[in-house]
Swiss-Prot record:
Gene3D superfamilies: YVTN repeat-like/Quinoprotein amine dehydrogenase. This is WD repeat-containing protein 82-B. GO terms for biological process: DNA-templated transcription termination; lncRNA catabolic process; negative regulation of DNA-templated transcription, elongation; negative regulation of lncRNA transcription; nuclear RNA surveillance; positive regulation of transcription elongation by RNA polymerase II; RNA polymerase II promoter clearance. It comes from the Eukaryota. GO terms for molecular function: chromatin binding. Its main location: nucleus. InterPro entries: G-protein_beta_WD-40_rep, Swd2/WDR82, WD40/YVTN_repeat-like_dom_sf, WD40_repeat_dom_sf, WD40_rpt. The lineage of its organism: Eukaryota, Metazoa, Chordata, Craniata, Vertebrata. GO terms for cellular component: chromosome; PTW/PP1 phosphatase complex; Set1C/COMPASS complex.
Length: 313
């Protein structure tokens, strides 16, 4: 089944889970698409089975809190950032609920975390104005970059380069093997004082970069030329909430939730809005991602919703 405008318009909430007492701050699908794991401001980690459509288990990170949870390539392991006490990144085995390793180094809150799509490397960006490069096998930082502002960062789909959005005004591209030589490309954007960038994502085909903000718009950028292709708006975000925006796996569409529980979908190429879906969420939709392998997506406020299409094209 192929994603089309009509298929997207047909999506409806199939299941809602109320496992959390506070907002879900992040979730991540496993590479197989079979499970999704969430982190929440209530200090819990919840693992869901996407095929059976039910929560499998709940773990807690009471002391340090949990945010920016990400699957690694090994089965049943995740990395995540702390949101209280310290700014250490933690590597957890879900199998026995034990920490495998800690990654200390950042002196302020980690705001961006990206796992390499190909190996055990990951990068983290922090309010301490640094990006650090790590290897899951070592607690020591493998590389450090000092920047001129708050960073958001992500690997490209090949895992050969990473992009850093700095101070909400420029995107720099780095070659992973020689990042200490500085960026090989820098794209300056129009600075907007009304909001800041909250995330940077590549499309799966590597051609597009999506810049999310805590304002009322998103920017879609050509990953090779740095030109802004589209600015997407018309959704509600009056309280400057961090709303997650995502590409669909085919790189054809972009979606974002809003503070009023609706999901807005645009066509990347034309820039046209193709759907507004009502998730009936009780709060702002802070997290939204399409499943990498199956025709389903998930959205979250303090509740988690699984969506399915109601037509088969």
């Amino acid at each position: 089944m192929k994603l089309t405008d009509n298929v997207l318009r047909s999506f409806r909430v199939a299941k809602v889970f109320r496992e959390n007492s506070d907002k879900i701050n992040c979730f991540d699908f496993s590479p197989t698409g079979e499970t999704v794991i969430s982190s929440s401001d209530d200090d819990s980690i919840v693992l869901y089975d996407c095929q059976e459509g039910k929560p499998k288990r709940t773990l807690y990170s009471k002391k340090y809190g949990v945010d920016l949870i990400r699957y690694t390539h090994a089965a049943n392991t995740v990395v995540y950032s702390s949101n209280k006490i310290d700014d250490t990144i933690r590597y957890l085995s879900l199998h026995d609920n034990k920490y495998i390793r800690y990654f200390p180094g950042h002196s302020k809150r980690v705001v961006s975390l990206s796992m390499s799509p190909v190996d055990d490397t990951f990068i983290s960006g922090s309010l301490d104005k640094t990006i650090r490069l790590w290897d899951l096998r070592s607690p020591n930082c493998q590389g450090l970059m000092h920047l001129q502002g708050k960073p958001v960062c992500s690997f490209d789909p090949e895992g050969l380069i990473f992009a850093a959005g700095i101070n909400s005004e420029m995107v720099k591209l780095y070659d992973l093997r020689s990042f200490d030589k500085g960026p090989f490309a820098t794209f300056k954007m129009q600075y907007d004082r009304t909001c800041e960038w909250t995330a940077l994502k590549f499309s799966n085909d590597g051609k597009l970069i999506l810049l999310s903000t805590n304002g009322g718009f998103l920017r879609l950028v050509d990953a090779f030329k740095g030109a802004v292709m589209h600015t997407f708006g018309g959704y509600n975000n009056s309280k400057a909430v961090t709303l997650e925006a995502s590409f669909t796996p085919d790189s054809q569409f972009i979606m974002i939730g809003s503070e009023d529980g609706k999901i807005h979908v645009w066509n990347c190429e034309s820039g046209m809005k193709v759907a507004v879906l009502d998730g009936k969420h009780t709060g702002p939709i802070t997290c939204l991602q399409f499943n990498p392998k199956f025709m389903t997506f998930a959205s979250a406020c303090s509740n988690m919703a699984f969506w399915l299409p109601t037509i088969d094209d």
